[in-house]
A protein has these predicted regions:
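Active-site-adjacent structural elements that line small-molecule/cofactor binding pockets in enzymes
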Residues: 1-178
Length: 178
């Protein structure tokens, strides 16, 4: 899968000479273009931001199609996921507010003629202090909210070096796998 996020730091866009304010609309167009390039021998595409004249990529990806997962949680991102996304890396917890965001995304998918249950959701659980009870409660909450995938975030857990992070991920997997 390909993860797509439009970013929040305007300085990154300024450094590239790009307009920060249209980054979302540009990314929507880019996703349409990518999907055409991945699936067609030759593409003719004219959008607001991009134009491709009788070109293609070779070799094309073996996997058809590459799932595109979006990150974020702003209203426009939620709409983008419902209309274009194959999955979502939400930036919230699976509480009542998070469940409202998921319901909103699913409605946008229905409105776009898509199956909302075909859009994956990856719940992210902080490693925290390494408490399996907390992880399992969080995993159950994400399951109830409709998450199709889970990940653990080991950042800011006081771990040192790759080996400790890898061991933390193993511990998490064992704890929630039962």
């Amino acid at each position: 899968r390909l993860g797509v996020g439009i970013g929040w730091n305007h300085v990154e866009y300024e450094a590239l000479g790009e307009n920060f304010s249209n980054r979302g609309r540009r990314s929507e167009e880019q996703v349409k273009l990518l999907r055409e390039l991945w699936t067609k021998d030759v593409v003719d595409f004219t959008g607001r931001y991009h134009r491709v004249n009788h070109a293609g990529i070779n070799p094309r990806p073996i996997q058809q199609t590459i799932p595109i997962w979006f990150g974020g949680g702003a209203d426009r991102v939620v709409r983008r996921i419902g209309e274009q996304g194959d999955g979502w890396f939400p930036q919230f917890q699976p509480d009542s507010e998070g469940q409202e965001r998921i319901a909103m995304m699913r409605q946008f998918a229905k409105d776009a003629g898509r199956d909302p249950m075909a859009i994956g959701i990856e719940g992210r659980i902080p490693f925290g202090d390494g408490d399996p009870d907390i992880w399992n409660k969080a995993a159950a909450a994400w399951d109830e909210a409709g998450a199709t995938h889970l990940s653990v975030n080991t950042m800011r857990a006081g771990l040192q070096g790759p080996d400790q992070h890898i061991e933390a991920i193993r511990k998490f997997k064992e704890a929630i796998s039962g």
